[in-house]
Amino acid sequence: GDVYKRQIRNDSLIYAYGKEMGRQCRRMGIQVNFAPVLDVNTNPQNPVIGRRSFGEHPEQVARKAIAYAKGLESEGIMAVGKHFPGHGDTSEDSHHTLPVVNHSKIHLAKNELLPFKHYIDAGLSGMMTGHLLIPALDSTTELPASLSPVIVDTLLQQKLRFRGLTFTDALEMKGASSYPDQALTALLAGNDILLKPIIPGTQIERLEKALENNEISHQIIEEKCLKVLRYKYILGLNRYRPIKTENLIEELNNPNAERITRQLFARSVTLLENKNNTIPFSDLEKRTFGAVSVGVKAKTSFQNMLQNYAEVTPSLLYAGMKPALTNETIQQLSKYNTIIIGIYSEKKENIELVKRACKGKRPILVFFVSPYALNAYKDILPDAEAVIMAYESTPLAQEYAAELLFGGIEAKGKLPVNIQGLYAMGEGLKTPITRLGYATPEEAGMDSRI
């Protein structure tokens, strides 16, 4: 997902990430990457875009997505922006239904369409059309955007002047699967490549019959074939060489790739509250640390990294835990004057455990979940000594959250979305480095291979 890249202010790092992704694609013989997501995630209840989006501000989404796409294309990999004309403001998933986006043309132009327009103006190569019903853009056909000539041909290709390859989203998805002539309809709408049509043989037979009946012209088919062939040449497929698998894993997971990934995570962790400048911790000799991870059943990378800096007693709380053990774990926390709570779950049962663990205390809360989950914890946020958003529970996100607490890295991240009534997009406090951090040789300007 893009969640940890969207709170990074330095777009050159996102370009480097895209470039490294392009290098890895090329090494594996991949010519096309169905990224970046250009959807503006303005609906916190969105079940399918969410953390895949670069945020909820159209200009920010455009800037970061274009940086990533340019990085990809600098390595000869086609970027494919998606899901035109915008899947961000819906609470439904087009894998399972046909979402409806009910906004005016003016709203769509200023929000959903803006990143796509900037992407097209930047001269990038690929676009994916989404399975969405958008009455303001097409009130005549009642077709999803991916199958609508008004949206694909008239809007995308004529008005916005997109000249690259147009792909449909997967046609087997519920948002498009109910149309029996989906392949014919998609081609007539203006798409060039059809992804995963239902029963391809049947769809091909239908296209052959359509050619015989003049429902679609040979010229349209030939133009699309020539367009695909042109891009095959551009992407080097006229000089195809089999991929050598020797040393593949080592070359993919090289030190530079790790350096970029680590930089992305280090710059994304966001400090939202820091009462009394508690973070980074000082006077360690006066502190006793208890660190409970909630929503997991095994000791975490977060707890391991905390123990690299101080004597920290780890514990766990999770839904389904024996009541006696739950009570004992919560009671034990009162022994420590510094309580760190790592939050790994948005489940109701685990939220209640966090609230119980916080009662009567001034904890440091560290969230390894979506920022939208903060709403579920709003009752306990005022009592927290500090609040950190790490966005996900990958090992690096956990390790850098721990380093931030102890001053091994500086706090730089900015919240990429608005959390209604709590935090505004762009919020994020800064802290200095006060202790040594943990890094790879490449991050220190050295070469680990020497």
Predicted features and spans:
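Short, small-residue-biased leader/transition segments that mark boundaries at the very start
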Residues: 3-4
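Glycine-rich anion/phosphate-binding loops
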Residues: 8-23, 58-63, 108-110
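Acidic-leg catalytic submotif of subtilisin-like serine proteases
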Residues: 20-34, 281, 290-291
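Hydrophobic beta-strand scaffold residues
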Residues: 32, 79, 166, 363-364
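Flexible hinge/switch segments at interdomain interfaces of large molecular machines
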Residues: 34-43, 84-90, 237-245, 430-433
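Preference for extracellular/luminal or secreted protein segments
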Residues: 158, 179-447
